[in-house]
Amino acid sequence: NEIKSFLPVQSIIKKFLIIFLVFIFIPNKLSSMSHIVDDKGIIVLMYHRFEENKYPSTNIKIADFVKQIDLIKKYNFNFINAKDFKSNLVNLKSNKKILLTIDDAFKSFYEQAWPLLKNEKIPFILFVNTREIGSNGYMTWEQIREISKEKFVHIGNHSYSHDYLVDKQDDEIIKDIDLARRDLKKNLGYNSSFFSYPFGEYSINFKNIIKNF
């Protein structure tokens, strides 16, 4: 299985960098990246679960993930970290840059993909919806702290509840995001300037709340 499509991102919104992307990984030929090697922008790849076959819409087999990483290397793309992503949005110097993001902090990421990323020091952002941390199927705070100690890793805000926040009132949205922010500060010692919308869904109002948070 190879990577079929990528979506470039070049938008920056004040205090929070908003990542609300949906990426599709579909079987294709190895040459499937050749049509984007000259594209301008930063490619962001989003993953969720690894080797959790009962969740096909958000799952990827670890063997396919390894193939995708190898494919990225084959075409000489550069993996960038959160800091470089932010600076490159302000001053786009070149193409062929890729940022990996992982949503939800599922336990399967820690068990399946983390060893590979750690061994190869591939940078990524792990977006955490903090209410679920430590519950069944999710990572623990201890595991997240372990990961966050690596310089190539950044832990981002993915809300507290992972609810459909676009349906909530302003005060509910603010409370939810603030709870996640407080959890991150308490457990990791910092507040992230990166936010990933739950389900990739947002509204103008929601975006403005994040913008001014």
Question: PLM features: what roles do these ranges have?
Answer:
Residues 11-15:
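Positively charged n-region of N-terminal signal peptides that target proteins for export
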Residues 26-98:
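N-terminal pre-catalytic segment of deacetylase/amide-hydrolase enzymes
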Residues 103-105:
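Noncatalytic alpha-helical scaffolds and linker/capping helices
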Residues 207-213:
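Short, intrinsically disordered, charge-balanced linker/junction segments flanking boundaries
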